[in-house]
Amino acid sequence: MIKKLTLASIMASGVLYADTIGGEISFGIYSHTPSGTASYTLPHTTLGSEVDLENDFGWSNDQDIMLKAYFELPLPFMPNVKLAYSNLNQDGTGNVTDFSWGIISGSGDIETDLALQAYDVTAYYELLDNVVELDAGLTMRYLNGDITVTPTVGFDFTTPIGSISSPTIGVPYPTDIDMWIPMLYGKARFNVPNMDISLQLEANAISYEDTTFYDYELSARYTFSMGLGLEAGYKSIHLDSEDLADGLVVDIDFSGPYASIVWDF
């Protein structure tokens, strides 16, 4: 009898342990349309003109990838973990007048490029877990990339050509972005009763001194068998900051639809 009770206890604890282990992995593609302004002023100077991302830089709709992985840990008081990666790429051409960006100053044609990667590590707690699910926590986001401006043939420089700091036609001039940003994290999901459909809002946000940064995803999901599902929704990113790089000021938005393949295990 004792052996049977012990075996039953082990099996019960094993089921309980297995029940508490879970997670989710998703891979998606999101479409983003830019809007807003940016400027880059060399340190200790007053130069630097504000440019419009669409009209001056020629940025338009583009597509990029996004990855997310959630791990629900079975340890008491230990937070769950979410890892995420997304990239944000834009490129375009524009014709500018009285343009000033770092050491580039003048009028004419330019090529521009944004290459930005975001890496998230999120620790969160599950506050509700039934028809309504609610998570809250803290995200540490690492931004790495650059904004590059290249003056092309025909650009009329107003800075003296030939000086040590003078720009050159056809040479790209990147402005590097490299920083960590702490953000508050939250997720709310409504599981429609008796259906394999759920509605979800997930967001990160922070506002301090010269920076306001937030992103959110509003989505609907249909789950098939074995935890596999499809998710579609709307993703928006807003960044208003003077802290990305010394002299770089941005007030930009990227938003558009996205779709993901999801595995809930």
Residue ranges and their predicted role:
Residues 22, 253-265:
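Outer-membrane beta-barrel "beta-signal"
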Residues 77-81, 131-134, 194-199, 227-230:
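Repeated loop/turn-to-beta-strand initiation elements of outer-membrane beta-barrel proteins
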Residues 196-211:
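Transmembrane beta-strand segments that form the barrel wall of outer-membrane beta-barrel proteins
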Residues 27, 67-73, 121-125, 138-140, ...:
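Residues on the lipid-exposed face of transmembrane beta-strands in outer-membrane beta-barrel proteins
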Residues 179-185, 211-219, 229, 252-258:
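Transmembrane beta-barrel architecture of outer membranes
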Residues 25-31, 81-87, 136-142, 188, ...:
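Transmembrane beta-barrel strands of outer-membrane/channel proteins
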Residues 1-22:
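Cleavable N-terminal export/targeting peptides
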Residues 33-64, 85-117, 144-179, 206-208, ...:
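Extracellular/periplasm-exposed beta-strand and loop segments of Gram-negative cell-envelope proteins
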